């Protein structure tokens, strides 16, 4: 979700691939302490002093909306991968983000959960996407 939001605000970003993006962070923004604890437990946030200003950080969660950013990111290339058995972010969220973009390549990896970075099928799809981006942009 963050990559989609960042890409939408940066015109030099030509393409984005995202794993299981939530359409928005509304559920998390209702309980930011839980999000912070979860992010620390899975190693996403490792700095014990983060965030410096918890209230400001928690307020920013209301503005993280991949569904809105996907529409802004179009017509640039967006690929979304989602595990068919994801129990953290519903597959429906990725479908909504893809629909908001209008031309996103949505790949549902059957039998995969939320941790797609450990699924060789998802990594193979991602590497194929990277190759296509390289060659389509002559990088």
Model-assigned labels for residue ranges:
Residues 2, 6-7, 21, 97, ...:
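Hydrophobic residues on the short alpha-helix immediately C-terminal to a glycine-rich phosphate/catalytic loop
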Residues 73-74, 79-82, 86:
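Short beta-strand/loop motif that positions the catalytic acidic residue
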Residues 87-93, 117-118:
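Conserved alpha/beta-hydrolase "acid-adjacent" motif
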Residues 120, 132-139:
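Alpha/beta-hydrolase-fold serine-hydrolase catalytic core, especially in secreted/extracellular enzymes
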């Amino acid at each position: 979700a963050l990559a989609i939001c960042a890409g939408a605000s940066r015109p030099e970003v030509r393409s984005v691939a995202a794993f299981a993006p939530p359409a928005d962070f509304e559920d998390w923004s209702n309980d930011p302490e839980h999000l912070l604890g979860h992010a620390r437990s899975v190693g996403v946030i490792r700095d014990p002093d983060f965030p410096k200003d918890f209230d400001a950080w928690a307020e920013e969660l209301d503005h993280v909306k991949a569904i809105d950013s996907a529409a802004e990111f179009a017509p640039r290339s967006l690929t979304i991968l989602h595990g068919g058995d994801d129990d953290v972010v519903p597959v429906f969220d990725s479908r909504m983000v893809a629909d908001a973009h209008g031309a996103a390549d949505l790949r549902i990896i059957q039998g995969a959960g939320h941790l797609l970075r450990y699924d060789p099928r998802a990594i193979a799809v991602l590497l194929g996407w990277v190759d296509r981006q390289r060659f389509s942009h002559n990088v």
